[in-house]
């Protein structure tokens, strides 16, 4: 405490110490540093699955990333985070949402489509086939909606990229099981610009699904 007082980071105020303006600045810097270390720790095991845009972000923006990682006791943490974001958006455009992410959220997705949320999903044919065969009636009902568009693409990146009203989500999948391993969401403008370009690139090459051809 004496050293902090000598540096004029704190001052005595009655029977307690309070931070001075320089001390408050030091606290802010330390909190930012701790946030960055915590973000790095959470991302450590999935860095290699993330797009370059995340690694290229200035470290000062790391505190603006919300990182949700699955663990053995809470394997659906990324799914739950995505579902909470889905509840608050009026649009969803997603490249490679994957079965592991969308299947647990199907009820919520259906509710949001019924509420008028505009949804476009671009995924691999096998993923669409899963929903068409597992939930044939529900899939047929969704496909009849004018605010629900499903497209297929054969060559997608290994991660998912989603655009919501005010957030961008990046989902990482476990290579062997396909489970949602982690999710990053943020409102950093550079990430949103990147996500928009990813969506537009794959959207331009995507094809409408043909349910009968997929099932056959």
Model-derived features with residue positions:
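PLD-like (HKD) phosphodiesterase/transphosphatidyltransferase domain
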Residues: 44-121
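Residue-level signal for threonine
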Residues: 20, 102, 124
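HKD-type phospholipase D/PLD-like phosphodiesterase module
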Residues: 125-162, 166
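Amphipathic alpha-helical interface segments
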Residues: 162-216
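Alpha-helical linker/hinge and terminal dimerization helices associated
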Residues: 30-50
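Short, solvent-exposed amphipathic alpha-helical segments in soluble enzyme
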Residues: 108-111, 137-139, 200-201
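Basic, Lys/Arg-rich alpha-helical nucleic-acid-recognition elements, primarily the DNA-binding modules
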Residues: 1-37
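Short His-Asn-centered micro-motif
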Residues: 94-98, 122-125, 153-154, 164, ...
């Amino acid at each position: 405490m004496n050293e902090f007082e000598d540096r004029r980071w704190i001052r005595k105020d009655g029977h307690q110490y309070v931070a001075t303006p320089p001390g408050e600045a030091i606290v802010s810097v330390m909190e930012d540093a701790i946030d960055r270390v915590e973000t790095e720790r959470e991302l450590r095991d999935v860095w290699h699955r993330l797009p370059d845009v995340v690694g290229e972000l200035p470290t000062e923006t790391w505190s603006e990333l919300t990182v949700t990682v699955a663990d053995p006791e809470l394997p659906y943490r990324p799914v739950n985070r995505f579902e909470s974001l889905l509840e608050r958006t009026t649009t969803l455009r997603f490249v490679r949402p994957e079965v592991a992410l969308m299947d647990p959220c199907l009820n919520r997705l259906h509710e949001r489509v019924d509420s008028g949320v505009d949804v476009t999903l671009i995924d691999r044919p096998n993923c669409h086939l899963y929903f068409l065969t597992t939930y044939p009636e529900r899939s047929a009902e969704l496909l009849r909606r004018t605010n629900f568009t499903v497209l297929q693409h054969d060559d997608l990146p290994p991660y998912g990229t989603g655009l919501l009203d005010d957030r961008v989500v990046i989902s990482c999948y476990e290579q062997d099981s396909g489970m949602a391993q982690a999710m990053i969401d943020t409102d950093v403008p550079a990430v949103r610009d990147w996500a928009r370009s990813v969506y537009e690139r794959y959207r331009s090459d995507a094809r409408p699904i043909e349910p009968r051809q997929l099932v056959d």
